[in-house]
Amino acid sequence: MSEPLRLFLSEEVARGIRAHGAESYPNEACGAMLGVDGERREVRALFPLVNRRDDSPRNRFAVTAEDVRAAERAGAEQGLELIGWYHSHPDHPARPSDFDREHAWPWYSYVIVAVGEGKPREMYSWRLADDRSHYLPEELPAEVSAPPAG
């Protein structure tokens, strides 16, 4: 049996994802996750992006090729690499949609935070299977996946 997939991130990084989701509500927030992928995959910095989706920003997000290049440059300047993406699901669970799966790439981590009525809720991470047929759950530290207290 293979080891479960894991993504490590600090409470500070988790707060950043949740804050971006709350600030962007009722639209989806999105951003890049910069970090390392060696002995363990760890997010060390966020690179918030503007949701460039004009037609349905409440339930979709889009980034441009220039956004991707900017995130990669920012990571390189810090000795980090682009290891994944985060986005919010306003008034929906933190589970990937079919649209998310159709527009995702294998290897990357995808963190989704649910934002209900403007308040961040649970947060989960996923990786797309190599055959693109489904997502594989990726464990987050327990202290960051649960909804924030209060």
Task: Tell where the protein language model's regions lie, with residue ranges.
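Conserved beta-strand-loop surface patch within small alpha/beta domains used
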Residues: 1-82, 90-150
